A protein has these predicted regions:
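Solvent-exposed beta-strand sheet faces enriched in polar/charged residues
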Residues: 12, 71-73, 82-84, 127, ...
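Conserved polar catalytic motif of the HATPase_c/GHKL fold
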Residues: 48, 52
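ATP-lid-like helix-loop hinge signature
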Residues: 53-74, 82
């Protein structure tokens, strides 16, 4: 399942790295002239997944020494990204998010990010490879 990337970025597992991730995604989307919709979905999904890794994959005491790798590959008619970390095992495909609340008063903050990722990504694949979590997301590109 390993992705042969055309681009990659290594991030420290720190919230401050999200800005660098967002700039990287923006640069790639502009360079490859990806449609605005795909660029927005890609940015939202990567921000959500990497935020979850930063928040939950590593103990707080070792977080600043931990890393997250993101690989990007454009393979028309799709874009693929692979997110890799060596945190605690977590299969987002097995995670069942809570149903959205029916009223604003009943709603809770958090827990909706993976729902967005599932909605926006055309395909999600996860595997645990030794001590690594690997999540691949694909996004369909419109036909010209």
């Amino acid at each position: 399942m390993s992705l042969e990337p055309s681009e990659h970025i290594a991030l420290r597992a720190e919230v401050s790295e999200l800005e660098r991730l967002n700039r990287w995604v923006e640069r790639l989307c502009e360079y490859h002239e990806l449609p605005e919709r795909v660029a927005l979905q890609l940015d939202i999904c990567l921000t959500e997944v990497v935020t979850n890794i930063i928040s939950y994959a590593y103990p707080e005491t070792t977080r600043s020494m931990s890393a997250v790798a993101v690989r990007f590959a454009l393979r028309r008619p799709e874009v693929a990204v692979e997110i890799e970390d060596h945190g605690v095992p977590f299969d987002p495909l097995a995670y069942i998010p809570a149903q959205p609340a029916s009223t604003l008063e009943d709603s809770q903050v958090g827990g909706h990010g993976l729902r967005l990722v599932r909605k926006f990504a055309g395909e999600m694949r996860y595997r645990r490879d030794g001590s690594f979590n690997r999540l691949r997301l694909t996004f369909a590109l419109p036909r010209h």
